[in-house]
Swiss-Prot record, chain B:
Belongs to the complex I LYR family. The gene is lyrm5a. Signal peptide: none annotated. Coiled coil: none annotated. It comes from the Eukaryota. PANTHER family: ELECTRON TRANSFER FLAVOPROTEIN REGULATORY FACTOR 1 (PTHR21024:SF0), GROWTH HORMONE-INDUCIBLE SOLUBLE PROTEIN-RELATED (PTHR21024). This is LYR motif-containing protein 5A. InterPro entries: Complex1_LYR_dom (IPR008011), Complex1_LYR_ETFRF1_LYRM5 (IPR045296), ETFRF1 (IPR052000). Pfam families: Complex1_LYR. It comes from Danio rerio (Zebrafish). GO terms for cellular component: mitochondrion. GO terms for biological process: negative regulation of oxidative phosphorylation; respiratory electron transport chain.
Length: 254, 85
């Protein structure tokens, strides 16, 4: 097998950071906030690198769309073992409205350009939680898709994907080329250590513009309002069982 | 006279310092502890003992990586999966 795998990585606000909504409700505060690679993208990168280590594929290419800073995310992917990176430059207004459809178009165009035979993505990003990019990419390319993968194996010229579905697992076999999206249990991503980050600086990151790929990144979606989730109501302490039963009756629970 | 293990020790310190940036209790807390731990052994000269201490440091690196992974995994599981009954 001498295939090339394309892995999409997204730069998001770090999972451990408390998200704050902008006072004017147009979005969330991103300035001066720690960013890192989307956890599900880490799983996708790890899976691709593992396939390479097993010599089932030839090359792992990490792709990210966004402003200059996404190069850090690509660098993390390179430190984890990806061979080279592609930075699709999208900035300013276009980046603010960049959604799954636009990214899918970019990924689909790149997959054709790079002659990739497999695309591995995270199932969703922890910032917008769209869970659409993998599905749309597969649709645009007219490739089969294995979403929510918790196990991946090559079987002859096909790919066996075990999928996480409600209440259990589903095993499917799909033809290559294909799109796979990684679920949480697919693997344990390795840590991008300092020595590896340093070594990754020698790896190449190519710069591409969406226009070079013939992709229009304009969006037809408009964000009307971004709100904080409702805060949880405080509980009450009750002294006796009678009190408790009384309160429950009041609330109509018994 | 510079110790041949000097480079190794510096490498270990740098790697730990880098890992400390993600420490749940904060970078400053971690750096202080890290420095104290290294300074405590600054007078060790026996190469065998230094090697043992380096090995322990490498073990701590593995532990920290495992800690960060588990912390992230648990956060993701809590956010995206129904609690198991």
């Amino acid at each position: 097998m001498s295939a090339r795998v394309l892995v999409g990585v997204k730069r998001v606000i770090d999972y451990a950071v408390k998200i704050r909504v902008k006072p004017d409700h147009t979005g969330v505060v991103t300035d001066g906030v720690k960013h890192s690679m989307n956890p599900f993208c880490e799983i996708a990168v790890e899976e691709a690198v593992k396939l390479k280590e097993k010599k089932l594929i030839k090359e792992v290419v990490a792709v990210s769309c966004g402003p200059q800073q996404v190069q850090e995310t690509i660098r993390t992917a390179l430190a984890m073992g990806a061979d080279r990176g592609i930075h699709v430059e999208v900035s300013g207004k276009d980046y603010e409205t960049l959604g799954p459809l636009q990214v899918s178009k970019i990924l689909a165009a790149l997959a054709k350009k790079e002659e990739a035979s497999l695309i591995i993505l995270g199932k969703q990003a922890i910032d917008d939680d769209c869970n659409q990019t993998g599905q749309m990419t597969a649709a645009l390319l007219d490739w089969p898709q294995g979403t929510f993968a918790s196990e991946l194996a090559f079987e002859a010229d096909k790919l066996k994907v075990v999928r996480e579905i409600d209440g259990g697992l589903e095993t499917i076999k799909i033809k290559l080329p294909a799109v796979v999206t990684a679920d949480l249990r697919l693997n344990t991503p390795r840590y991008a250590t300092l020595p590896n980050i340093m070594k990754a600086k020698k790896k190449k990151i190519a710069m591409v513009k969406p226009a070079d790929l013939g992709v229009d990144v304009s969006s037809r979606l408009e964000v009307l309002k971004v709100d904080e989730p409702p805060t949880r109501q405080a509980g009450v302490k009750v002294e006796t069982v009678e009190d408790l039963v009384g309160k429950l009756k009041e609330a109509g629970r018994v | 006279m510079t110790n041949p293990l000097r480079g190794e020790v510096i490498r270990l310190y740098k790697n730990l310092l880098y890992l400390g940036r993600e420490y749940p209790k904060g970078t400053a807390y971690f750096r202080e502890r890290l420095k104290t731990a290294f300074m405590k052994n600054k007078d060790v000269t026996d190469p065998e003992k230094i090697q043992k201490l380096i090995d322990r440091g490498d073990f701590v690196i593995k532990e920290l990586e495992a800690l960060y992974y588990l912390r992230k995994y648990r956060a993701m599981k809590k956010r995206y999966y129904e609690p198991e009954h």
